[in-house]
UniProtKB/Swiss-Prot annotation:
It is found in: Cell membrane. It comes from Mycoplasmopsis synoviae (strain 53) (Mycoplasma synoviae). Pathway: Lipid metabolism; phospholipid metabolism. Belongs to the PlsY family. Keywords: Cell membrane, Lipid biosynthesis, Lipid metabolism, Membrane, Phospholipid biosynthesis, Phospholipid metabolism, Transferase, Transmembrane, Transmembrane helix. This is Glycerol-3-phosphate acyltransferase. Probably interacts with PlsX. Catalyzes the transfer of an acyl group from acyl-phosphate (acyl-PO(4)) to glycerol-3-phosphate (G3P) to form lysophosphatidic acid (LPA). This enzyme utilizes acyl-phosphate as fatty acyl donor, but not acyl-CoA or acyl-ACP. One of its GO terms (biological process) is phospholipid biosynthetic process.
Amino acid sequence: MEIFLSIAINILIFWIGYLIGSLNASIIVGKLFYKKDVREFHSKNAGATNSLRVFGYKVAIVILFIDIFKVVFATYFVRIVFPFVFSPKLYFYIPLIAGLAAQIGQAYPIYFKFRGGKGVAATVGLLISINVLLWPIAGVFFFLLLFKTKYVSLSSLLTTLIMIGFISIPWMSQGVLSYATSGFGQFWVNIIIYLFAAALIFWKHRENIKRLLSKTENKMKFKK
């Protein structure tokens, strides 16, 4: 009985995260305040980068933090609330599933015909949910790679791969800064969840990968 209930609880966690993640900030902000659908411009992507092109950097920063925060919120909501209803001693469930589901919702939002972003900002939220130290680590690698390559997409993809190594360190998932995941399964559970998130990022960047291989991907221009 506990096994079936554990499965049901994890399915519930997934749906909670997915519905939260489907609240795509760039689409909502664009339609509410600018009467524009960000998906109709430039890359057609509903994320912070395209919002920068359409609405400017101030709005893009707000959207970026919303996309990050909603993943953290979904994970911590499950981590804080669910133990009051479902005892972790009786049932096996994983709060980080809510974070992964929120990333999927960001990429394929149910409220907006499943046309969303590429999930990069949402993956940052997933990293924070695992361990807040992973955020600055990822940031350092991303900006170093961006400065070196000038490609936002390539920097995002390489940083995604690099972070697998850091997540594989047991302390990152079970240490004092891992409140949302510590005590909910072994550290390898987080690795598996992150691998799914990484796979989604690569899938959503498949056109960028083609352009990178053909050397037609646009480079970031730095102002002096």
